[in-house]
């Protein structure tokens, strides 16, 4: 089977990761002790992608849990999910990274990294045919961002031919823990551009807006935000976990979604959006699901897809529905909004349908868009970065950990390059006299950046 090793790192990564295991455990009929209590053979057909079958028909997650302080680990261990994980899958330090990327990447994180790699190797060796890794982390703190990107470098060195995906939570001033978030985020994105094959950008600002506007929650908690993330992660991984034809493994997903190597940052979306613990009272039609899924208000990244153009799109529909109707709805959306999709990539909207709906819903849809408007997210964080770096504010916290100040400049210019690449492909129009030359020029420039 094609196995995936899941790594969650830092406080945010561990909280979201724990929620992910809770949700997919429910979907596959795996209880908190790791025993199967499901009802459908489909639940077990591809169970080995995320679970290892241990002695006595116990299913153990292929997970590595990492943090530089013990707090989050202890709360997972003492939760009802605690006995699900293998005890030596927990790797933690005691000092914390103090929201400092350099501590996570160069000092505290570097001391712990070999222990983490030992667990990663052990998990990889227990696989028949490892397809790749997925890392869950945030970019605003110190551990998830600094140590998370260090771990990606190490995995890239040791497993250069395996796919590496990340679920990365972008920081936002609306849900902010710390003043140096822009530094941590830009330094991390610089690494994500080079080392990941696909990055699912989950944005606290967008999650906050969804809770506020769509779900009408007056004071959203991290629990509410994590609930939305777990719905999306469950949807994105559906075609990896259940039998299906499209995007059935990480490499196929990357091939369908990434037209140019550096442009691998996706905006996820989900429909229907429901608040934690509440049920949907009215069954949605396929047309309403499709409409909601493409709605900017359902997108989990704080940028407006209407201001950009879609290079590629993947849609995962779940529940009992007509595939023909799904195809018709997507075709009509593409026809009505043809200027939102680049015309020089034909057939750039891919659809998968899975019979098994998420728990508590009859039908649901998950959306993955590679849209040039994602540059807004990078522009926002890079402006905050530049405002502080111009005055060298807080830089001593980073240089005192042995980090070179030139890294700040490199990371900043890399993000600027990324933004201009997205802009370039947004501006290319097919059908004009020089359009093919435009595309070729843009491709050549993008390739130059890769080398």
Curated annotation (Swiss-Prot):
Q: Which UniProt keywords apply?
A: Cytoplasm, Cytoskeleton, GTP-binding, Isopeptide bond, Magnesium, Metal-binding, Microtubule, Nucleotide-binding, Phosphoprotein
Subcellular location(s): the record lists: Cytoplasm, Cytoskeleton
Q: Where does GTP bind?
A: 11, 69, 138, 142-144, 204, 226
A GO cellular component entry from the record? microtubule
Q: Which residues carry this modification: Phosphoserine?
A: 172, 435
Short sequence motif MREI motif: positions: 1-4
Q: Drop me one GO molecular function for this one.
A: metal ion binding
Q: How is the protein modified post-translationally, according to the record? A: Some glutamate residues at the C-terminus are polyglycylated, resulting in polyglycine chains on the gamma-carboxyl group. Glycylation is mainly limited to tubulin incorporated into axonemes (cilia and flagella) whereas glutamylation is prevalent in neuronal cells, centrioles, axonemes, and the mitotic spindle. Both modifications can coexist on the same protein on adjacent residues, and lowering polyglycylation levels increases polyglutamylation, and reciprocally. Cilia and flagella glycylation is required for their stability and maintenance. Flagella glycylation controls sperm motility. Some glutamate residues at the C-terminus are polyglutamylated, resulting in polyglutamate chains on the gamma-carboxyl group. Polyglutamylation plays a key role in microtubule severing by spastin (SPAST). SPAST preferentially recognizes and acts on microtubules decorated with short polyglutamate tails: severing activity by SPAST increases as the number of glutamates per tubulin rises from one to eight, but decreases beyond this glutamylation threshold. Glutamylation is also involved in cilia motility.
Q: Does the keyword Magnesium apply?
A: yes
Looking up Pfam families in the UniProt record yields: Tubulin, Tubulin_C
Work out whether the entry's keyword set contains GTP-binding.
Answer: yes
Tree of life domain: Eukaryota
**Which cofactors does the annotated protein need, by name?**
Mg(2+)
Q: Where is the composition biased (Acidic residues)?
A: 433-451
GO terms classed as biological process: microtubule polymerization; microtubule-based process; platelet aggregation; platelet formation; spindle assembly; thyroid gland development; thyroid hormone transport
Q: Which CDD domains match?
A: beta_tubulin (cd02187)
| Positions that bind Mg(2+) | 69
Where primarily located?
cytoplasm
Q: Which residues carry this modification: 5-glutamyl polyglutamate?
A: 440
Annotated region Disordered: the residues are 430-451
Q: Which family does it belong to?
A: Belongs to the tubulin family.
Functional note: Tubulin is the major constituent of microtubules, a cylinder consisting of laterally associated linear protofilaments composed of alpha- and beta-tubulin heterodimers. Microtubules grow by the addition of GTP-tubulin dimers to the microtubule end, where a stabilizing cap forms. Below the cap, tubulin dimers are in GDP-bound state, owing to GTPase activity of alpha-tubulin.
Entry note about domains: The MREI motif is common among all beta-tubulin isoforms and may be critical for tubulin autoregulation.
Quaternary state and interactors: Dimer of alpha and beta chains. A typical microtubule is a hollow water-filled tube with an outer diameter of 25 nm and an inner diameter of 15 nM. Alpha-beta heterodimers associate head-to-tail to form protofilaments running lengthwise along the microtubule wall with the beta-tubulin subunit facing the microtubule plus end conferring a structural polarity. Microtubules usually have 13 protofilaments but different protofilament numbers can be found in some organisms and specialized cells. Interacts with RANBP10.
**Name of the protein in question:** Tubulin beta-1 chain
- Originating species: Mus musculus
Native organism taxonomy? Eukaryota, Metazoa, Chordata, Craniata, Vertebrata
């Amino acid at each position: 089977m094609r196995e995936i090793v899941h790594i969650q790192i830092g406080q945010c990564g561990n909280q979201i990761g724990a929620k992910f295991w809770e949700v997919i455990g429910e979907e596959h009929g795996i209880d908190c002790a790791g025993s199967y209590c499901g009802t459908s053979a489909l639940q077990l057909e591809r169970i080995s992608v995320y679970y290892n079958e241990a002695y006595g028909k116990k299913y153990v997650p292929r997970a590595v849990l990492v943090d530089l302080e013990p707090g989050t680990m202890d709360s997972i261990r003492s939760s009802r999910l605690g006995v699900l994980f293998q005890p030596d899958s927990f790797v933690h330090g005691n000092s914390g990274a103090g929201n400092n990327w350099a501590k996570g990447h160069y000092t505290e994180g570097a001391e712990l990294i070999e222990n983490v790699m030992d667990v990663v190797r052990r998990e990889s060796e227990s696989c028949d045919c490892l397809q790749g890794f997925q890392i869950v982390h945030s970019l605003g703190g110190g551990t998830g961002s600094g140590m998370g990107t260090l771990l990606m470098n190490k995995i890239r060195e040791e497993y250069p031919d395996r796919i590496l995906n990340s679920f990365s939570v972008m920081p936002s001033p609306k849900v902010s823990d710390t003043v140096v978030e822009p530094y941590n985020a830009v330094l991390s994105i610089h690494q994500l551009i080079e080392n990941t094959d696909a990055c699912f950008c989950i944005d606290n600002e967008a999650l906050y807006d969804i809770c506020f506007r769509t779900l009408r929650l007056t004071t959203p908690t991290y629990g509410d935000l994590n609930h939305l993330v777990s719905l999306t992660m469950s949807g994105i991984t559906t075609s990896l976990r259940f039998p299906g034809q499209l995007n059935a493994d990480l490499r196929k997903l990357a091939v369908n979604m990434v037209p140019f190597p550096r442009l691998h940052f996706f905006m996820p979306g989900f429909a229907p959006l429901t608040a934690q613990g509440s049920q949907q009272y009215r069954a949605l039609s396929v047309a309403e699901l499709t409409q909601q899924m493409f709605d900017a208000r359902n997108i989990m990244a704080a940028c407006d897809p209407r201001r950009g153009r879609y290079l590629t799109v993947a849609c995962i529909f779940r529940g009992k529905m007509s595939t023909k109707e799904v195809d018709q709805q997507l075709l009509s959306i593409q026809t009505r909004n043809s200027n939102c999709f680049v015309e020089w990539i034909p057939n750039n909207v891919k659809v998968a349908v899975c019979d098994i709906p998420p728990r508590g819903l009859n039908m649901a849809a998950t959306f993955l868009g590679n849209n040039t408007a994602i540059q807004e997210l990078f522009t926002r964080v890079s402006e905050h970065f530049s405002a502080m770096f111009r005055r060298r504010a807080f830089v001593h916290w980073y240089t005192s950990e042995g980090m070179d100040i030139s890294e700040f400049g490199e990371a900043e210019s890399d993000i600027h390059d990324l933004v201009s690449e997205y802009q370039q492909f947004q501006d290319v129009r097919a059908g004009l006299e020089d359009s093919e030359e435009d595309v070729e020029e843009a491709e050549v420039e993008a390739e130059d950046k890769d080398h």
